[in-house]
Amino acid sequence: MSSLSRELVFLILQFLDEEKFKETVHKLEQESGFYFNMKYFEDEVINGNWDEVERYLGGFTKVDDNRYSMKIFFEIRKQKYLEALDKHDRSKAVEILVKDLKVFASFNEELFKEITQLLTLENFRENEQLSKYGDTKSARAIMLVELKKLIEANPLFRDKLQFPNLKSSRLRTLINQSLNWQHQLCKNPRPNPDIKTLFVDHSCGQPNGARAPSPANNPLLGSIPKPGGFPPLGAHAPFQPAPTPVPPLAGWMSNPPAVTHPAVSGGAIGFGTPTNPAAILKHPRTPTTANPSMDYPSGDSDHVSKRTRPVGMSEEVNLPVNMLPVTYPQSHSYPQDDFHKNVARTLSQGSTPMSMDFHPVQQTLLLVGTNVGDIGLWDVGTKERLVLRNFKVWDLTKCSMALQASLVKDPTVSVNRIIWSPDGTLFGVAYSRHIVQIYSYHGGDDIRQHLEIDAHVGGVNDIAFAHPNKQLCIITCGDDKTIKVWEATSGAKQFTFEGHEAPVYSVCPHYKENIQFIFSTALDGKIKAWLYDNLGSRVDYDAPGHWCTTMAYSADGSRLFSCGTSKDGESHLVEWNESEGAVKRTYQGFRKRSMGVVQFDTTRNRFLAAGDEFLIKIWDMDNTSLLTTIDADGGLPASPRVRFNKEGTLLAVSTHENGIKILANADGVRLLRTLENRSFDASRSASETVTKPLMNPLTAAAAAAASAAAAGTSSGNAAPPAITALNGDSRSLVDVKPRIADEPLDKSKVWKLMEITESSQCRSLKLTDNMRTSKISRLIYTNSGVAILALASNAVHLLWKWPRNDRNSSGKATASVSPQLWQPPSGILMTNDITDNPEEAVHCFALSKNDSYVMSASGGKISLFNMMTFKTMTTFMPPPPAATFLAFHPQDNNIIAIGMDDSTIQIYNVRIDEVKSKLRGHSKKITGLAFSNVLNVLVSSGADAQICVWSTDGWDKLKSRMLQIPSSRPSSIILDTRVQFHQDQLHFLVVHETQIAIYETTKLEPVKQWPVRENSSPITHAMFSCDSQLIYASFLDATVCIFNASSLRLQCRILPASYLPQNISSNVYPVVVAAHPSEANQFALGLTDGGVYVLEPLESERKWGNPPPAENGSTSALSTPPNGASSSDQPER
């Protein structure tokens, strides 16, 4: 059925609903299969109308269509069966078993037998799994929750759960428009025509009473243009008997998929590549939030898109991690925590902010560009301005004569746009005069000149970063009506796109279906789309307002929005239907005459924000009505600039008095409070050591390989690192003489290593268990932080859960409250498939993001366990080879990287039970795997002391290197090499018995190392704290050392006597460390005797000592000690 015919069905459905033909409405829904009315379905389930439930479902899916459908029908029929048993209607139960449930026996015979055995019980609740079954009403409600999840995940229901957003009585409106048009064609139109029928075209009667000719032979109608010549009615094209010419890009483009891809723009990848790359945006399956139970006139978004999954593996195990939650767009009862009502910071920039952008990884770093050409870098957590640079041309001799003349005539320059690169190692500034300047960022206040490009004649109106052909590029547009693409390392120009007839105002690069493209808007309101070739524009559409318009995608890359203001001050915020190049939704609530160009931003795939009428206005993406307004305690300009940080916890807003207000939601407030505490600790430490405030040198090494410049562009030499004094003054180190050596130190204030030697100096808790436990091989906190999971060397899993009570209101893990060793009522243990000698097997596991499942192995098959029931869901991959390490892909939990004992890494797709790739590069077993979702790489480590970096796009090996291991040190015990990514996703931790090191991923070079002294105890394990500020390391002598992660200097040492009982054997030591996912100063240890301990600092201390002072007063570059050397603070152990 054509798209227009489908839309006609929706119009009829709306009409029937308005006319109260309720049964007919649902019959048409079922027969057409276009719209699944979740509200109706819910009502029928709650009322137990099982025949109607299955009849209605039958219009959309059948039992054997896919595994989702099978599970839906199974749950319904199982509930019907249980209700018959509950009523002691055995004959009805047998009938249901034979007619309805037997079809599932071929798929799971054991389950069918178990269901059949319920007939033998007097009360089916005697079955352990059904012991908590309540009354019929509550059981139906619980089942309904599961059914809704299955329906939302089922691809057959995609695009069928959301009713289009139609104005009321849309069909009547279209008929009236048609009648009006017909009336205009009458030869003798009457002032008040009498419409008696819709069965034939309207025509006013002849004055002499003669009959009007029929439409078929009416010469007037034959001579008028076809409907295609008339303006479209509403947002849809008119009904046409013949197909209209397809635009060059087939609408906008075609077939974007439903799964998000970790590309520059957060765009989407799919299951295949379209045959026509120029057709990438047509018929999108947009994974937006949706309301499954709304009435007809109000629904308007495409539905959440999810992958299929095998029966028995419900929830999130094999669903994409970035799947969106279902929300209810018609309900405005959002938690107040969602909104940025709190003014958390007020920053004084000194000139009017024109553009702002938060760092993509460090959530509190804010770039600001102003109307006088200044650029500033703020840490809004500490309220400190790290950098202030005034505009100047780096090399005037390399600039065009036009620019030189322009600057001589009028030296004033404004920043039009400032923006970070996707990984935060570069940022670009577009100025109102010809120039684009690119800086590299090395952490803290260290920014360096990278590229200066004389990009456009006139102003450079916008700048963006993109990754065409896996190469970082810079995209600019300007007053000269062109868009240009530059290579980000050398500044070489790659493309110039011409075709606009007015200055180009903005660019919006995006990625879909392996196709990179760019949207551009010009001051005449034209929107064009470009591929990275020389074939010209693929799209030519008009933006609402026909003037200054910017475009942006939602964070997941699935929905396209634009915001523009006309010359008359009329503002338009709209969502686009990419398949048709038409406006899908227009948001209401703007002032009729905006006093400036309205700016906007999106956050969390859920909200839109725009600055208008001295306010910040907020919309739900799925509702055109204004959701709320925020005045930020006043002081805002008429059209304030707005910018969210990546996580959506902070919102930067420009103020009237050359300042910026930082608004925070509840999560943002907590983030800033955490940083305030850390800032206070750091400043106290700084005053005690008489040194300047520390910056994070780990992040300083985050710059990508982008330091060289090519001919034709100006690439500035690295400037001396800047420091920021406490008064915010930004100066070069050249201008500041070090005073530390000249000032006498107060010895009582010199920094001192924190040593914990007895139990009274910290909080420690041994987790009790009632079974004889073997060595703890693996240990992890659940992602929620409320439990600890351990895997012992006897292949048994242990799960401790903390209670929520008066002593522990959060319910999270703590050393102050004892948890319970949790077991299901059945007494079943999660036990891995084992070999003949499990004690010598390699044990490994990986936990799903929602803590519902654990994938685990102990030398035998890999097992998938349900964490709620401890039930084994499936087993796969029998040895040999045996799995030695497991890691879920960060974008798709269907994909698992499995390290093997034969030195290979297998990329396994759970959903289709297939090995997609086999990576070869190591010579011994794999001992560590870690993904970076920023760099799109997998880092592996092996027993061969080799580290490899693999691209997750094509699974090619990018780099490899051997660890630097002192040749003079024999290996005392065989220990793994482990890897773990830093929070910035750019660096990773390497742990070996001889050393701890931090590597920069793209260059695969160590930026910091801490080698173990000769004849000292080897390292057994180490791990970052949840905020990557600390590293917890355990040693063979049971000592635990806590390092400052930015400097790899020892900050605290915990001796065994402080947490182990006195009578314990000297052979007992920690073999694994786990860090709490949200409490940075809490960690757990798994010991050789099977003990698990949780450690925290005293409540009076709150932390494990103070950070050590920076070496030699330096705060920037990370140094690497020579091979085998010891750091200056190396303790005697």
Swiss-Prot record:
Residue ranges, compositional bias (Polar residues): 1112-1133
Gene Ontology annotations of biological process type: regulation of DNA-templated transcription
Domain LisH per the UniProt entry, residue ranges: 4-36
Keywords for the protein's UniProt record, in alphabetical order: Repeat, WD repeat
WD repeats: from-to residues: 348-388, 410-449, 455-496, 499-540, 543-586, 590-629, 634-673, 771-810, 837-875, 878-918, 921-960, 1014-1053
Keyword Nuclease applies: no
Domain CTLH: 34-92
Cited InterPro entries: CTLH_C, LisH, Quinoprotein_ADH-like_sf, Topless_fam, Topless_Znf, TPL_SMU1_LisH-like, TPR1-like_2nd, WD40/YVTN_repeat-like_dom_sf
Location of region: Disordered: 287-307, 1099-1133
Annotated tissue distribution: Expressed in panicles, stems, leaves, spikelets and seed endosperm.
PANTHER family per UniProt: TOPLESS-RELATED PROTEIN 1, TOPLESS-RELATED PROTEIN 1-RELATED
Domain notes: The N-terminal TOPLESS domain (TPD) (1-209) binds directly to a 12-amino acid LxLxL EAR motif peptide.
Protein name (Swiss-Prot/TrEMBL): Protein TPR3
Gene: TPR3
